[in-house]
Amino acid sequence: MNVKGRVVLSMLLVSTVMVVFWEYINSPEGSLFWIYQSKNPEVGSSAQRGWWFPSWFNNGTHSYHEEEDAIGNEKEQRKEDNRGELPLVDWFNPEKRPEVVTITRWKAPVVWEGTYNRAVLDNYYAKQKITVGLTVFAVGRYIEHYLEEFLISANTYFMVGHKVIFYIMVDDISRMPLIELGPLRSFKVFEIKSEKRWQDISMMRMKTIGEHILAHIQHEVDFLFCMDVDQVFQNNFGVETLGQSVAQLQAWWYKAHPDEFTYERRKESAAYIPFGQGDFYYHAAIFGGTPTQVLNITQECFKGILQDKENDIEAEWHDESHLNKYFLLNKPTKILSPEYCWDYHIGMSVDIRIVKIAWQKKEYNLVRNNI
């Protein structure tokens, strides 16, 4: 074969490889896995400093790499459309669970198994082509003890059938477990600064989540959940949980009177809630909503945390105390029953039909730097 023929053949081979690769990464079998070392995302900048590399899983996710601009445009158009949520009467029937509280005094639904029609909701949100984000933090020994099981279970049960982005915050990227992703799923991993005290790790996540929402998350997802890593999904956590602002009932306190709640009772704290006030006790292990609402939650909670630091006081249950104060003043539009975050140490209540997420064993002596 002459030189010209070899050149033509080489060009054909290269073109074929490029076409095959392009088709692969734009198929459900192509998976991309982002890692970012930027500790502080540049607010207002769409360009994230970092890098991505392909991670070829058997059941990978659709590639978002070439779609980010299109997704951003689609999100903006969706905002302009100003589509509302599906009317409550179309998917929610509080009378199906008369033995528990299913409607708050401000008319927000409390979602229990049996009260919702997931098929109707899945069909509604599928037409909107929603993307749901999930943030999770794993610092220090929490990575080895909890992160892999959390991600594997979330991959199986979180928002099945809908596009999902997992935002994983770790202090050591080299210890990040590689997980086989299901269809429509992708990871974005960010390296964050570790704190000396576990209390500060817990409270600083509010600041970090807010920064990432402003920098990029608000352009990438329609709804966002923030969850603790020391829990595991056991059943479908689906679109019945989506709402403008979503709070989780704390399993140990869902039947208690507000005066029994472990609210912050010291007036000096920004999280102070006096006796005689309060609706429910909310668990900081799960909260969510639209990016705008979650941004407001995290900013207001962090503002309270900073105010407490200036006054040399720390709320009794740290970020959770501030979250409860926030939801007292800004009522959640949807509340999740304890089925969505159950502790088996309580035993099995007749109220709990299906456990969606379960607490993991709290091995604080092994995972926390200071007790």
Curated annotation (Swiss-Prot):
Its EC number is 2.4.1.87. Keywords: Glycoprotein, Glycosyltransferase, Golgi apparatus, Manganese, Membrane, Metal-binding, Signal-anchor, Transferase, Transmembrane, Transmembrane helix. It is a single-pass type II membrane protein. The active site is at E320. It catalyses: a beta-D-galactosyl-(1->4)-N-acetyl-beta-D-glucosaminyl derivative + UDP-alpha-D-galactose = an alpha-D-galactosyl-(1->3)-beta-D-galactosyl-(1->4)-N-acetyl-beta-D-glucosaminyl derivative + UDP + H(+). Its main location: Golgi. GO terms for cellular component: Golgi apparatus; Golgi cisterna; Golgi cisterna membrane; vesicle. The chain crosses the membrane at residues 7-22. Pathway: Protein modification; protein glycosylation. Its cofactor is Mn(2+). One of its GO terms (biological process) is carbohydrate metabolic process. Residues 1-6 are cytoplasmic. Binds 1 Mn(2+) ion per subunit. PANTHER family: GLYCOSYLTRANSFERASE-RELATED, N-ACETYLLACTOSAMINIDE ALPHA-1,3-GALACTOSYLTRANSFERASE. The conserved DXD motif is involved in cofactor binding. The manganese ion interacts with the beta-phosphate group of UDP and may also have a role in catalysis. This is N-acetyllactosaminide alpha-1,3-galactosyltransferase. The gene is GGTA1.
